[in-house]
Regions:
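Compact beta-sheet-dominated domain cores in extracellular/mature segments
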Residues: 25-155
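Secretory targeting and sorting signals
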Residues: 1-25
Length: 155
């Protein structure tokens, strides 16, 4: 009987532990966009209620809070050295940030409406497969039209 109970407990632990993306403990309710992205893009780790990261992809998601919206800088909220793609025009709304360079995949459900190239050199292109939709030189940003499937970063 003890062996059976231990097997059931261990099996339950494996099922619960492997049920979804890795998540840090947080008393706040996780933003629905963060939950959706963690379900849609494998390998994500929940940082807090409004942030998730995909270490293997060099990608992070940030959903701004009311406080974040009032603390915006001249280059949006994209940290130095990153390329960020925003869901709304003029560097507004939730955004994905990329630390790598090359051809960077944009998740299928993500709509890019503006892009910030907060790198010191080169340029970034929002593209639909190979068609360039918009280009942002180093230290600048641009609004984006059309359906973006990838970002091409060139040093």
């Amino acid at each position: 009987m003890r062996r059976y109970a231990a097997s059931v407990a261990l099996g339950t632990l494996f099922v619960v532990a492997g049920a979804g993306p890795a998540m840090a403990e947080s008393p706040e309710e996780v933003d629905p966009l963060v939950v959706q992205m963690l379900e849609d893009v494998p390998g994500g780790v929940l940082v807090d209620a409004t942030h998730a990261e995909w270490p293997e992809l060099g990608m992070a998601l940030t959903v701004p809070t009311a406080g974040d919206l009032s603390a915006r800088t001249a280059s949006g909220s994209c940290a130095s050295g990153l390329i960020c793609v925003y869901k709304l025009p003029s560097l507004s709304g939730a955004f994905l940030s990329y630390s790598g360079c090359g051809v960077l995949a944009v998740p299928g459900d993500w709509t890019v409406r503006s892009m910030d190239n907060n790198r010191a050199s080169g340029y970034a292109q929002a593209r639909n497969v190979t068609t360039v939709l918009a280009t942002a030189n180093a230290g600048s940003w641009t609004n984006v039209g059309g359906t973006t499937t990838n970002i091409r970063c060139v040093f």
